[in-house]
Amino acid sequence: MKRWAIASDPRTWVDAHLHLWNSSLLAPPWLAQAPHFAGKFDVSRYQREGGAAQSMVLIEADVAVADREREAQLLDAWAQETVVASTRECAIVAAIEPNRVSFASELAAMKRIPRVRGSRRVLHAGEIEFGTRGFAQDMQSLSAQGMSFDFCVRWSDLAKVDQLACELAPMTIIVDHLGNPPLRAGWNSPQAQQWQRLIARVASNGNTCVKWSAMFENAGGALSLAQARPWFEWCLACFGAQRVLWGSNWPVCFAHASLVEWIELSATLAGELTATEQDQILRGAACATYRM
């Protein structure tokens, strides 16, 4: 790969994976186990901690089922404030859960919020019912409404994502966080080799994208360029720049590293690519995927 070492300005990027919440208004249940994430994490704080993206995709934060619509409304209100205060554009990925009794009402409620462009569920904490007819049917309903779906799964479950992506083409399927690879095991580990095969299978479906995000979280801390590069370059080779989306995963990823460190590492790796590839990864792919 030819290395150009010219990084684009982070102020021109689209952050395709940003979480916002104010726990005094609505507290995700998992904050009980992560009290350091209690408080107000809004656009102003994101900017103070180094976030400078031109536009943003606001991602649901695994709130309680009863709070999902309220969360989307709060995200939409914050998005409106951001749009009014700056030239930034925002899209929302809301919590809409396939194969749940309340799915139809959740989908109808989210469709009333124009900035909602897709849905996501955190599925790495439990069993994924990909094989059920209800799950597939509800995914088809999402697709019929023009919704994409973000999968946040364990890397060992990527084969299920591959199967579903094949069945549901042309629905847009986004794999969050490079498929949560086994970074702690190391690039030369048997686990990494399994991840390589699985993420390549997912990428073979033309309706899939991958988010370049959460590497520090999966590693348990900041990474060096040498540690991060092979995982990024593998996904780039599998998906192509037009299907790789950069995201911060702020603030979730930064208990042991900073947002600035992630932006600097990302800028250096992206800076090794052509200007066209940089534009696709850092802006264009997110705009196309989330219709921004």
Where are these regions (language model features)?
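Active-site environment of divalent metal-dependent phosphoester hydrolases
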Residues: W21-S24, V63-A66, N99-S102, G126-E127, ...
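Mid-to-C-terminal alpha-helical segments outside catalytic/metal-binding sites
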Residues: M1-V14, L25, L31-A32, F37-S55, ...
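Histidine-centered catalytic micro-motifs
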Residues: W13-S23, V175-L178
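Alpha-helical scaffold segments that flank or form the walls of functional sites
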Residues: A32-T87
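Catalytic pocket-lining loop regions of alpha/beta-barrel enzymes
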Residues: G131-L245
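Short, well-ordered coil/turn segments that N-cap beta-strands
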Residues: P10-T12, A52-V57, S86-A91, I113-R117, ...
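Active-site gating/metal-coordination segments in enzymes
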Residues: E69-D157, Q163, K211-N218
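Conserved, mostly hydrophobic/aromatic
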Residues: H17, M56, I92, S119, ...
